[in-house]
Regions:
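FAD-site-proximal beta/loop scaffold in flavoenzymes
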Residues: 15, 20, 25-42, 138-184, ...
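Glycine-rich Rossmann-fold phosphate-binding loop(s) that bind the pyrophosphate
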Residues: 52-54
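A structural signal for the hydrophobic beta-strands that form the central parallel beta-sheet
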Residues: 10, 34, 98-100, 130, ...
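Small-residue-rich anion-binding loops in enzyme active sites
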Residues: 1-12
């Protein structure tokens, strides 16, 4: 189908990356989430875990530590790749437990998350812990494949917008939401840039008259 228009707003979003475990996929919506800010309040006073070693994982862990009784961070490598500031914040939060060289073998539970079976990839040791929530913080993939070679993007595939606007490198083409935002990724910020894109598009169309 071909649709002709004088202006376009791209708002195809970004998709959270998951581990790909069958048990993880089965329990999405039953305790497995990719957004601590969205779903963290469901686990007030409970024990949860986060998978990831970057700034996002560290930020979500410190956020969850304020409302959950215990937060376990599972880092696949021997150290976090988060900034030194975030690493310091994590290690100085008493109810955060860091487990390095650790990967999930299976998410335990049938209808809801009840625990984790983990494997230390350095020693081969298997361990199980009880949790009620699992947060995946290993990044997002912007849904921009269809725009490759047409729209300017950064190395991660996020659309580059210019200055404080939603303008792209193509006149009349604007981008809003998670497709151009790798930092905030919230519904309210996406809605805000959507409003900005609509205003930018309106001004562009007015300039064509």
């Amino acid at each position: 189908t071909e649709i002709q228009a004088q202006t376009i707003i791209i708002s195809t979003g970004a998709t959270a990356k998951y581990l790909g475990l069958p048990s993880e996929q089965r329990l999405r919506g039953g305790g497995v989430s990719a957004c601590a800010v969205c779903d963290g309040f469901f686990y007030k006073g409970q024990e949860v875990a986060i998978v990831g070693g970057g700034d996002t994982a560290a930020e979500e862990a410190t956020y969850l530590a304020k409302i959950c009784s215990k937060v376990t961070i599972l880092v696949r490598k021997e150290q976090m790749r988060a900034s030194k500031v975030m690493q310091h914040r994590v290690t100085n939060t008493p109810n955060i437990d860091l487990k390095y060289n650790t990967e999930i073998d299976e998410v335990l539970g049938q209808q809801v998350v009840e625990g984790l079976r983990m494997k230390n990839n350095a020693t081969g040791t298997i361990e199980e812990i009880p949790i009620t929530g699992l947060f995946i913080a290993i990044g997002h993939k912007p849904n921009t494949d269809i725009f490759k070679s047409q729209i300017d993007m950064d190395d991660s595939g996020y659309i580059i917008t210019h200055g404080k606007t939603t303008k792209t490198n193509l006149p009349g083409v604007f981008a809003s939401g998670d497709v151009q935002d790798k930092d905030y990724r919230q519904a309210v910020t996406a809605a805000g840039t959507g409003c900005m894109a609509a205003l930018d598009a309106e001004r562009y169309l007015a300039g064509l008259e």
